[in-house]
Amino acid sequence: IDGLTGKILWQFQDTKHDVWDLDVVGPPLLTEIKVNNQTIPVVIALSKTGNILMVNRKSGKPIFDYSYQSVDAGQYPNQETSLKQKKFTLPEPISSINFDMNNDVTKLSKEQESYVRHKLRNAQSGNYPASNLKNDVVIFGVHGGPEWPGGAIDNKNRLVIPSNRYPSIIRAWFAIQNNKIDSNEEIIKLESYQTYLSNCASCHKANLSGYNESENTGDSYFPSLVGISRLKSKESLTSLKAFKYNHKYSNDINLMDSDTDDYIIYQSDLDELYDLFTKIDYITKSEQVIISEFQLLLDNHKLPGSNPPWGYLSSTDLTSGKTLWKVPFGIATDKITKKNYPGDMNFGGVITTKSGIIIATGTRDEYSRFYDADNGAELYKVKLPYAGSSPPITYMYKGCQYIGFNSTGGRFAGYGKNGDAFVVFKLDSCATEENI
């Protein structure tokens, strides 16, 4: 954008028709690179897809070529996503959104794997999988790859990026405008609605809207039952076997008879409920709208539903576009088994120093870490009062270099405590009275 006139001089897009929340994140980074003995001014932007977008900042032309790949089309009424998306080879992407249903589901234990696979029973994955009303979508990347803290460039023109690799579920469902079902006289007078209130409303709510817990607190989910007769067959909705399987992990709701260990939902109840859902969908069809939200995919230990590492730190050579190294960043702890796993969710950021040090923060273990910029080796770590919540800063005062950490904790599930600390360090060699 021309700062004087506001005119758009050029633009470059990563994800077309983005319905996955795969935005370009972090502040743009400016540097210069050598191409065929010519110095080119470039601007670098990072995407949650894992792509590193590097273009000539005068012309907007990408430094490296890219191609297009075919992807699925969306299935929302009257809407389709783009049939093609950009595919970058260089700079090498530091992550991918593709979730492999066969290999990426957690293998930490049979119990955890079984739980996650059950959560994914109606899900699909792939390369930019199309969101739709009949299937959930599971991808990496809703929180990166890279995230809002962005990356940093060191004095050897290497790009350092903290990134995430844990999956999210994207769901779409029908809802009623203003949620009027439980105040609709035509509906509430139905005898079958009383059956619903007695057996289902404690989880799916009196207005059938269900519950999708915020990822800031957890991953509880009870699907909306609005429009269900439009989406599923009568056979599947009245099958007692399917009902029991779908409620396999619903031990906290009133499905079991404690005396006989039998389900207290019977075939006659399912038949009655199907008739109710059919009537409700007929009455409210003109008021039904589509809602879509995402949620972390967690296992029953509240760990990400994929295999660790769940967070990385990486370095990319900006001249060649090649990844130089990639190491796990942070430690995740299973609060049930007390086991530690390398690489965790991170929302802090990095800075680099002229001496070849990378300083990184933002993991849930509340440590800030110091790395060798040449190889990614961890040199030192320091525990903060709360998780780092923004990139570290460095400054000079009376000839001494200081490093500061904004330590306030995180807002997503698993970050635990929050506060308002700002923690500053300086070199021991500066700790003389005249420099204080």
Annotate each language-model stretch with its function.
Residues 22-47, 85, 89-93, 148-152, ...:
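Repeat-blade elements of multi-bladed beta-propeller folds
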Residues 174-195, 211:
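Electrostatic cytochrome c docking/interface patches
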Residues 156-162, 168-174, 393-436:
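Blade-level signature of beta-propeller repeat domains, shared across WD40, Kelch, NHL, RCC1
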Residues 1-6, 56-60, 311-317, 418-431:
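Beta-propeller blade signature
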Residues 27-77, 427-429:
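Phosphate/diphosphate-binding loops
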Residues 202, 211-230, 234-283:
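Axial heme c-ligation environment in periplasmic c-type cytochrome domains
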Residues 15-27, 67-74, 134, 138-149, ...:
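Conserved blade-ending motifs and adjacent loop-strand segments that build the rim/top face
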Residues 290-293, 318, 322-378:
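Generic long, charged, amphipathic alpha-helical segments
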